[in-house]
Swiss-Prot record:
<dbReference type="GO" id="GO:0042742">
    <property type="term" value="P:defense response to bacterium"/>
</dbReference>
<keyword id="KW-0391">Immunity</keyword>
<feature type="binding site">
    <location>
        <position position="71"/>
    </location>
    <ligand>
        <name>Zn(2+) 1</name>
    </ligand>
</feature>
<dbReference type="GO" id="GO:0051879">
    <property type="term" value="F:Hsp90 protein binding"/>
</dbReference>
<dbReference type="InterPro" id="IPR007051">
    <property type="entry name" value="CHORD_dom"/>
</dbReference>
<feature type="binding site">
    <location>
        <position position="17"/>
    </location>
    <ligand>
        <name>Zn(2+) 1</name>
    </ligand>
</feature>
<dbReference type="InterPro" id="IPR043316">
    <property type="entry name" value="RAR1"/>
</dbReference>
<dbReference type="GO" id="GO:0050821">
    <property type="term" value="P:protein stabilization"/>
</dbReference>
<feature type="binding site">
    <location>
        <position position="34"/>
    </location>
    <ligand>
        <name>Zn(2+) 2</name>
    </ligand>
</feature>
<dbReference type="GO" id="GO:0008270">
    <property type="term" value="F:zinc ion binding"/>
</dbReference>
<keyword id="KW-0399">Innate immunity</keyword>
<feature type="domain" description="CHORD 2">
    <location>
        <begin position="159"/>
        <end position="218"/>
    </location>
</feature>
<feature type="binding site">
    <location>
        <position position="213"/>
    </location>
    <ligand>
        <name>Zn(2+) 4</name>
    </ligand>
</feature>
<keyword id="KW-0677">Repeat</keyword>
<feature type="binding site">
    <location>
        <position position="196"/>
    </location>
    <ligand>
        <name>Zn(2+) 4</name>
    </ligand>
</feature>
<feature type="domain" description="CHORD 1">
    <location>
        <begin position="12"/>
        <end position="71"/>
    </location>
</feature>
<feature type="binding site">
    <location>
        <position position="50"/>
    </location>
    <ligand>
        <name>Zn(2+) 2</name>
    </ligand>
</feature>
Length: 226
């Protein structure tokens, strides 16, 4: 008996989903996705559709989608985000600033003044920590070791290795089961890439399609050390 195309497993191409589905099992609301692409600026990663953000790339990819609909194999067309350049505040010359500070009653009395950036010396001294205080702040109690959760070998899990995201069972896991990126993602000068394989592209969808460079075990923990 020939299996129809309706039962063929397909991968959803919506941003933030990537789930496997079939044409005969694709109800409205089964797909949770991001309606528009990401925005990267000053080390911050943000979804432009819902303004959810994170500094950590792995946590950023785990932010759930803000819209629901049907799965699709059509890749979304992403609008290129234009970074917002901060406008520098006007600065006054040192001579002019000194003149205004002399005429300002708050500055002359030693109070903090946001207009002229002065700060009383006593307040500065209080913010400085002595060497003994700094050492005390560094001493923290040791946290108890994290206990690994006991998982059924037949229980489906989602691999958290970067670049993988596949569903697996522990009974089928082995040393070459997972294709992933061991190194961190790198975002610099509007380029996106992986440090482990030194591949960099400009567009986010091209970045997500960079093939993994390493084989290994699937891991359901976002932290390889756990």
């Amino acid at each position: 008996m020939e299996v129809g195309s309706a039962t063929k497993k397909l991968q959803c191409q919506r941003i933030g989903c990537n789930a496997m589905f079939t044409d005969d099992d694709n109800p409205q609301g089964s797909c949770q996705f991001h309606a528009s692409g990401p925005f990267f600026h000053d080390g911050m990663k943000e979804w432009s559709c819902c303004k959810q953000r994170s500094h950590d790339f792995s946590l950023f990819l785990e932010i759930p989608g803000c819209k629901t609909g049907k799965h699709t194999t059509e890749k979304p067309v992403l609008a290129k985000s234009v970074p917002k350049h901060p406008v520098a505040a006007p600065t006054s010359s040192p001579d002019a600033n000194a003149a205004t500070k002399d005429s300002c009653s708050r500055c002359r009395q030693g109070f903090f003044c946001s207009d002229h950036g002065s700060q009383p010396k006593e307040q500065i001294k209080q913010t400085l920590n002595t060497p003994g205080q700094a050492e005390e702040e560094k001493i923290e109690p040791l946290a108890p070791p994290v206990q690994k959760a006991v998982i059924d070998i037949n229980q489906p899990q989602v691999c958290k290795n970067k670049g993988c995201g596949q569903t697996f069972k522990e009974r089928d896991n082995h040393e070459t089961a997972c294709s992933h990126h061991p190194g961190p993602a790198v975002f610099h000068d509007r380029l996106r890439g992986w440090k482990c394989c030194d591949v960099h592209v400009k567009e986010f969808d091209e970045f997500m399609e960079i093939p993994p460079c390493t084989k290994g075990w699937h891991s359901s923990s976002p932290d390889p050390a756990v």
